[in-house]
Amino acid sequence: MSQQTPQESEQTTAKEQDLDQESVLSNIDFNTDLNHNLNLSEYCISSDAGTEKMDSDEEKSLANLPELKYAPKLSSLVKQETLTESLKRPHEDEKEAIDEAKKMKVPGENEDESKEEEKSQELEEAIDSKEKSTDARDEQGDEGDNEEENNEEDNENENEHTAPPALVMPSPIEMEEQRMTALKEITDIEYKFAQLRQKLYDNQLVRLQTELQMCLEGSHPELQVYYSKIAAIRDYKLHRAYQRQKYELSCINTETIATRTFIHQDFHKKVTDLRARLLNRTTQTWYDINKERRDMDIVIPDVNYHVPIKLDNKTLSCITGYASAAQLCYPGEPVAEDLACESIEYRYRANPVDKLEVIVDRMRLNNEISDLEGLRKYFHSFPGAPELNPLRDSEINDDFHQWAQ
């Protein structure tokens, strides 16, 4: 092909710019129509913790799909990169950035924007020239690889010699077709992925529903283990509670028996003590009554030895002044045996016995005995009853003291 003049190249670039603008408008209109017609949110499912658990099983399920079984592998579609291709990538990235900047522009911009477009076109032409030079070098080095590559390189070399330095862009119809096909493939992939994810969610939901039904029926193994542990703990606590109750009841029974025994023994002790006191009191009363009855039965008392006690103005010694009156003893001083045997309650510090009265009593007794002996000796009989002696003052006082007690 013949080389183009600079004017023709400028005209072609202007036409391409117009086509690019039309393609951008068509893209915008198509995107708006697509957004109205297709609602991709219906195929999207919110991700959760379940999606993180997709492992080798999901990969196997993806591999088993009929659509992907006969699909070509990615490694067969992608050519192995060479050093030159890796060097091309930065330039291609710059080119794509410029194209995107172009597409984002809308007709009707000001002159500054047109100047910026011209500058971007110049940069693209420089990048294309660099890429073509690197492609030519790489194609010359890789001629011996295979026949197809050689043919492609020859075609590219011819195109390089014949093609103008201006950027060759595909037609808008082809771009629309490519975009439509790509969009259709992407939507198909998204739809299949959504179906797969929904299937996985359904399987997981079925498994969870099955476990829930097993839990409701009580046949879940983990739930059975948990119930068995709870039952074991409950039985242990019940056993301890029963043992504690049994021990407390035994303690209460022992305490009750001990209390009843104590009350019974105390009752018997009180009854025994009361019986003993009543018997002692009754016996003492009985002896007192009998003694008084015997005393009342005695009309003439027996002649007993009497120890006279010194009494002021009553006994013989005190009356005649033979001896002074006796003085009372202090509490705790001992009592003479002759007084104790006579049950004399008068206690004196000095000798309380009236010796003069004792002598007189002995003289009287001796006189009575001599008289009786004379009667027996001379008269051989008792002429009459003897004269009875009256009560002494000491005996009267003793009787008064007993009545006062």
Curated annotation (Swiss-Prot):
Q: Which PANTHER family match?
A: BREAST CANCER METASTASIS-SUPPRESSOR 1
Q: Name one Pfam family in it.
A: Sds3
According to UniProt, the name of this protein is Transcriptional regulatory protein DEP1
Which GO biological-process labels does this protein carry? cellular response to heat; negative regulation of inositol biosynthetic process; negative regulation of phosphatidylcholine biosynthetic process; negative regulation of phosphatidylserine biosynthetic process; negative regulation of rDNA heterochromatin formation; negative regulation of silent mating-type cassette heterochromatin formation; negative regulation of transcription by RNA polymerase II; nucleosome assembly
Q: Which organism is it from?
A: Saccharomyces cerevisiae (strain ATCC 204508 / S288c) (Baker's yeast)
GO CC field: mitochondrion; nucleus; Rpd3L complex; Rpd3L-Expanded complex; Sin3-type complex
Q: Which residues lie within the region annotated Disordered?
A: 1-26, 49-171
Quaternary organization: Component of the RPD3C(L) complex composed of at least ASH1, CTI6, DEP1, PHO23, RPD3, RXT2, RXT3, SAP30, SDS3, SIN3, UME1 and UME6.
Q: Which gene encodes it?
A: DEP1
Q: Which residues carry this modification: Phosphoserine?
A: 56, 120, 370
UniProt keyword Lyase present = no
Q: Which UniProt keywords apply?
A: Chromatin regulator, Cytoplasm, Nucleus, Phosphoprotein, Repressor, Transcription, Transcription regulation
Spell out the subcellular localization from the entry. Cytoplasm; Nucleus
Biological function: Component of the RPD3C(L) histone deacetylase complex (HDAC) responsible for the deacetylation of lysine residues on the N-terminal part of the core histones (H2A, H2B, H3 and H4). Histone deacetylation gives a tag for epigenetic repression and plays an important role in transcriptional regulation, cell cycle progression and developmental events.
For bias kind Basic and acidic residues, which ranges apply? 86-108, 116-139
